[in-house]
Amino acid sequence: MDEISSMLDYLGIKSTEELFSDIPLSVRKKEIGIGSPLDEHLVLERARKYASLNSTEMLNFLGNGIYDRVIPEAVNYIISKSEFLDSYTPYQPEVSQGMLQSIFEYQSLISDLFKMDFTNASMYDGYSALGEAARMAYRINGKNKILIPESTYDSKLSVLKNYVWGLSMKIEKYKMNEEGKIDIDDLQSRIDGDTSAVVVENPNGYGVIDENVFRISEIKKESLLISYVDPISLGVLKPPGEYGSDIAIAEGQQLGIPMNFGGPLLGIMSFKADYVRKSPGRLIGESVDADGKRAFVMTLQTREQHIRRAKATSNICSNQALLTLAAGSYLSILGSSGLKKVALLTIKHSKNLAESLGNIGIEKVFDSISFSDTLFRIDKNVMLDLAKKGILGGIKLTSLIKDSKYSSGTFFTATEKTDNEKIKALVNALEVIM
Amino acid sequence: MNFKQAYYEEPIIKDIKSSNTFSLSEQVDESILPENLKRKDLELPEVSEYDVVRHYTRLSQMNYTVDVGIYPLGSCTMKYNPKFADRVSAIDGFRNIHPFQPENTVQGALHVMYDLQEYLKKISDMDAVSLQPMAGADGEFTGILIVKKYFEDKGEDRTEIIIPDSAHGTNPASATMGGFDVVEVPSDDKGMVDLEALRAAVSKKTAAFMITNPNTLGIFEQNIEEIAKIIHNAGALLYYDGANLNAIFGITSPGLMGFDIVHFNLHKSFATPHGGGGPGAGPVAVKSFLKDFLPVPIVDFDGNSYRLNYELKKTIGKVSSFYGSFSILLRAWSYIIRNGDDGLKNVSARAVLNSNYLKKKLEKYYDIPYYPLKKHEFVLSTENTGKRALDIGKYILDNGIHSPTVYFPLIVKEAMMIEPTETVSKADLDNYADVLIEALKLSDEELKSRPKNTAVRRIDEVKAARDLKLKW
C-alpha cells in the first residue's frame, strides 16, 4: 500500500476530500485556472526566455538608491549554503548558533562602521527603516514634528508618510542651499519644542557630500538626530556616531546584495544604547549555555509582536536575516582596507565622470563633491536615447522629486566599477545625442 | 535517528587573524577627499577570503536547516523548497537589472510580475494585486493603510480593528501601526470566532475585521459567510491574513468567502527558503472597489508591452522603495507554474492529510483541544501530561527534528503548534510521533537536561537580556 492510502486507511476515510468536509459548499472553488503543471526543465526554459528580454549587458550609470557594485563571489557562495538559506527564524537557539552568530557579527560590524552603539537586524529597506526610525523617535520623545531635507525623493517621503500616518506626525521639509547642502538657517528656524527628530542625509538626495550634517547636533535642541547614510561612503566619510546621531539608517543593498530589480533589500538601523528598548525589530545577544559555553540568542523579545501584540515596537516578523549575512560576509571580506578602497574609487570615478562630461560642456548642478550620484545640467531627457546605445543612465531629478526647482537636473552614477573606458563610452554617446 | 550537531569553538570574525586578500588593482589617492570630511579610524576585521569562507562554513554546520530534516512548526510553513526556484531567481537576466532601467529593457521582469499578479488573482478570487509589500506583516500594514484611506475617502471616522484572540501577533501590531485601536474577540468552545461576541464588538467604529482562515488552531472558520455578513452589514471591511493559504489552494478562496483585502505570504505558501527569518514577500490583493487604493506601481499590459502603472487615483502611495521583493516574486511565479491547478490542490490535500494523520497518532497521549477536524496545522497542549511544552521541544531537537512553535497561540496552555506541511513523508511523521510519545516517558529532570546533542545546550536567556551584549 502506498503511503497516502495507508494514511487514509489509518484515518478511516476514503479520500482527502473528506478532510475538507468542514468547508461549506457555498464557498467551494471549481478550478484555479492556472493550467496544467509544467515540467521543471520547462519552467527553467520559460524563465530563461523572459530573463533574456531584460538587458543586463548595458553600461550602467544608474544609482539613486540601488548600485551596481563589485560583489565577491564568496558572498553569494556563503548565503547560498542551505544551512543559512533554508533555516528558520532562530526561535530554537540551540540548533541555530550559526545564524545567530552571523547576525551578532553583522550587528557588530555595522555598529563599528557607523560608530553607533547597537544595530538591529530586521528592516526591509532603507525607506522603511526611515519610517521605523521616525516611529521610534516618537516612542522616545512623544513629539509630533519631523524635519526632512527638500532633497528627499518623493517615493521615500511617501513611505515615511505611511509609516507615521497612524501617529498623526507632521512631516516638514527644510531647504538646501545653492551648494546642494543643508541650509542651516532655514533648518534652525523650523526646530521648535514639538520637533521629534531632524533627518539628515549624507550623501544627500542630490548626491552631494554634505559636511553641514556634522553641525546639526549643535542646533537640534531637544529633538533627535536621524542620519540617513550610504554605508559604502563610511569607508572614508565621518560616521554618524561621530556627529551626534541618535539613530542612523541606511539602505544596505550595496553590501554584497545584487540589484535584483530593486528587491529584496536590506534596511540598516543603528542607535544609541539608551534607546534599545524603544527600538523595532530583532536583536541578537550573547549569553552562555548550561555548560557555560558562549552562545547566542534572540533577546529583548518582550518588545516584539509575538509577545506584545498591539503594544509591540514594530510588526516585523519575516525580515532580512539572510541579507544581514550577505552584508556581514561582504564587510568581512573587504575589511577596512577594501571598503576604504571601494569608497575612494567611487569618489575618484565620480570626479572623472564630472570632468569628462564637463569637457563636452555638460556642467554639474552643484559645485560640491559628490559621492556616487552626480547631478548634471541637461535639459533634454536622454535616458531612452542612451538605452538605444546600450547605456543605462540619465534619470531626471524631477522623476524622483516632482516639484524640484532643478528641472534640468539629470543624474549619472559612478561606482568602483565605473572606469575610464566606460566613462568614455558615455561621453561619446552623449556627444551624439545632445 | 542518531543525531549529533557539529560544534566548533568558533571565534567571532574579529578575532580571526590573517591578512586581507580582497583587491581592486586601480590606484587611488586619499587626498581626493578633504580632511574635514574624512573619518579617522575604521575597525573592520582584516581577514583573508579563505578564512571568511571557512568561518561561515563552520557556522553553517552549527545551524539546522530544512535540507537536513523536517521543520514541523506551526504557522510558518517550513516546507522543502524545490531547487529550481532558487535557480530561476539566480539567472543573471533577473539578478542584474536596475529598478530605474527603461521599461523596454526589462520587459521579461515585468512580464513575470504581471503573470504573478494574474495567478494570485486566480488563486484568491480577488480583482487586483500590488506586489510591493516586502513581507507578510508589511502586507498587513499595507492592508490596514488601505482600510484607513478607504474610510477617509468616504468621510467616515472608524477607529477600531477587530481581531480574534487566536490571531497572529502581527495582526494587532499592524493595526496599531496604522493608528487603529484593537478590539479582541474570543474564540468559542470549538476554537472558532465567537459569533455573539463578534456581533457585540461590531459598531459604527469598526473599520475592519482581520482573520486568517483556517485559523492558527488549524480550524476552518465554518461561519465565515455569516462573519462576512456581520462585518459588511456594519459597513466595515473583511481582511484575510494569508498566512495559512496553503491549506485551501483550489478548495476555496478568500474572494469566495467574502473578503475584501488579502495579503499573501509568498515565502510560506509558495517557494522561498526562509533565510533564517527572511526575506519574504507579502503582496496585497483587493476587490475591485478598492483597486484605486493599492500601493503603486502595479504592472499593466496593453497587449504589446508591460508597463509600471503609477496612476491609481486614490493610492496610499508607497510602502517600500521599489516594486517589492522581486527575487522572491520570481520564486513564487516559478512554483505556481510548476504546480499548476492540480499541483497546488495536491499541496493543500497532502498538507491537510499529514496534519490530520499526525494529530490522530498523538491524540491518545496529548490533549488536542477544540473542533476535531484540522487543516494544515493543529495545536496540542502538554498540560495534561504534566510536562512543559518548552522541555519537550528541547528533547525533540536532540532527535534531529526541529521543535514545534511553542506557547502560541496564547489561548492554549502549554501549546505546541505543529504544521508538518506537504513535504513530510509518512515515515517522518511516524518517527516524529514516536519522539513526541517517548518524551512523555522521560523524567522531568531528564527533560530539563535537554538538549544535549546540539551545538550548545540550553541557553541562559535571562542573562542575555540582563547583561545586554549586542556587539563584540
From Swiss-Prot, chain A:
GO terms for molecular function: glycine dehydrogenase (decarboxylating) activity. Pfam families: GDC-P. It catalyses: N(6)-[(R)-lipoyl]-L-lysyl-[glycine-cleavage complex H protein] + glycine + H(+) = N(6)-[(R)-S(8)-aminomethyldihydrolipoyl]-L-lysyl-[glycine-cleavage complex H protein] + CO2. Its EC number is 1.4.4.2. It is an enzyme of class 1 (oxidoreductase). Transmembrane segments: none annotated. Keywords: Oxidoreductase. One of its GO terms (biological process) is nucleoside metabolic process. The glycine cleavage system catalyzes the degradation of glycine. The P protein binds the alpha-amino group of glycine through its pyridoxal phosphate cofactor; CO(2) is released and the remaining methylamine moiety is then transferred to the lipoamide cofactor of the H protein. The glycine cleavage system is composed of four proteins: P, T, L and H. In this organism, the P 'protein' is a heterodimer of two subunits. Belongs to the GcvP family. N-terminal subunit subfamily. This is Probable glycine dehydrogenase (decarboxylating) subunit 1. The gene is gcvPA.
Swiss-Prot record, chain B:
Gene3D superfamilies: 6.20.440.10, Aspartate Aminotransferase, domain 1, Type I PLP-dependent aspartate aminotransferase-like (Major domain). GO terms for biological process: glycine decarboxylation via glycine cleavage system. Its cofactor is pyridoxal 5'-phosphate. CDD domains: GDC-P (cd00613). The keyword Oxidoreductase applies. InterPro entries: Aminotrans_V_dom (IPR000192), GcvPB (IPR023012), GDC-P_C (IPR049316), GDC_P (IPR020581), PyrdxlP-dep_Trfase (IPR015424), PyrdxlP-dep_Trfase_major (IPR015421), PyrdxlP-dep_Trfase_small (IPR015422). The modification N6-(pyridoxal phosphate)lysine is found at K268. HAMAP family: GcvPB. NCBIfam families: PRK04366.1 (NF003346). This is Probable glycine dehydrogenase (decarboxylating) subunit 2. It comes from Thermoplasma volcanium (strain ATCC 51530 / DSM 4299 / JCM 9571 / NBRC 15438 / GSS1). The lineage of its organism: Archaea, Methanobacteriati, Thermoplasmatota, Thermoplasmata, Thermoplasmatales.
